[in-house]
Amino acid sequence: MHEMSLAVAAIDLAAEQATQRGFNKVTALWLEVGSFSCVDPDTIAFCFEAAAKGTVVEGAQLHFQHQAAEAWCYDCDKTVTLTERGQACPECGGYKLRVAQGDSLRITDIEVS
């Protein structure tokens, strides 16, 4: 379950940013989850709640934003949207693809008080 380590990293980063700026509470956190990130939002929410106990992030609302996977096709020189790993290019049917976005998890916003 890699979601626990991801949740802990997000908590640590949010807490660090809040305290560096003189805030003592993180009230909400927005995470962008790529469709190829292999991150389950329900699992990371569970891990987030458990790992946040006793930190300035405890009780913060967790919001998820979905990011579609996009790839560059070397065969047709187009950026295409993909729905699953291993999929052929929807434009030309080629398999020479490089994922350009949608394979990551990142914090997009932090709300503090």
Curated annotation (Swiss-Prot):
Involved in the maturation of [NiFe] hydrogenases. Required for nickel insertion into the metal center of the hydrogenase. GO terms for biological process: protein maturation; protein modification process. The keyword Zinc applies. This is Hydrogenase maturation factor HypA. Transmembrane segments: none annotated. Belongs to the HypA/HybF family. It holds the Pfam family HypA. It comes from the Bacteria. One of its GO terms (molecular function) is zinc ion binding. Keywords: Metal-binding, Nickel, Zinc. The lineage of its organism: Bacteria, Pseudomonadati, Pseudomonadota, Gammaproteobacteria, Aeromonadales. Zn(2+) binds at C73, C76, C89, C92. InterPro entries: Hydgase_Ni_incorp_HypA/HybF_CS, HypA/HybF. Ni(2+) binds at H2.
